[in-house]
Amino acid sequence: MQITLARIDDRLIHGQVTTVWSKVANAQRIIICNDDVFNDEVRRTLLRQAAPPGMKVNVVSLEKAVAVYHNPQYQDETVFYLFTNPHDVLTMVRQGVQIATLNIGGMAWRPGKKQLTKAVSLDPQDIQAFRELDKLGVKLDLRVVASDPSVNILDKINETAFCE
C-alpha cells in the first residue's frame, strides 16, 4: 500500500480536504482511521457521502487499518489517510504502518488544550505523541492549507515556548 498523504484533521472530510488535499494526495481512496468514528454509524455515513468526486472513502477501526495496510492484496493501492489525533497515528506506526510524513492540519481547541496556531491546539499527551512519532522517523509537517510553508510542529512548539 502506498500512502500518498497522511493528515491529522479532526474535521476529517470538509472543503479543504475535498477541493485541495485530495488533489495533492492523488490517491485512489481516503481511509479514515479512528475507532470512535468507525463506531458512529451516522458520522460514518455522512463522511462517505462527503467524498470528493471519483474517490472512495473507507472509515475503519485502527485494527482494520493496520490489517489492510499489511495485506498484500492491497499493495498496489494508493491511499490518503485521515486521522483525528496523533495518538491513532502513533498506534499504527508502532504496528508497522510506514508513514514517512504526517501533515498536521487541524486539531480544535477543547478544555485542557492550549492553542499553538489558529488551527491546532494541543495537550501534553498530543505533544508526547508527536515526539514519539519524531523519534520513530516520521516527518511532522504543520500546514493547514497546501500552500502554507511546511513547518515541523516540534520546532513550532519549541519556538513559541509552548508550555506542556
Swiss-Prot record:
Pfam families: PTSIIB_sorb (PF03830)
Induction remarks: By L-sorbose.
Active site: H14
Domain of life: Bacteria
Limits of the PTS EIIB type-4 domain: 1-164
The keyword Transferase appears for this protein: yes
EC number(s) from the headed UniProt entry: 2.7.1.206
Primary role: The phosphoenolpyruvate-dependent sugar phosphotransferase system (PTS), a major carbohydrate active transport system, catalyzes the phosphorylation of incoming sugar substrates concomitant with their translocation across the cell membrane. The enzyme II SorABFM PTS system is involved in L-sorbose transport.
Subunit description: Dimer of dimers.
Descriptive protein name: PTS system sorbose-specific EIIB component
Lineage per the UniProt record: Bacteria, Pseudomonadati, Pseudomonadota, Gammaproteobacteria, Enterobacterales
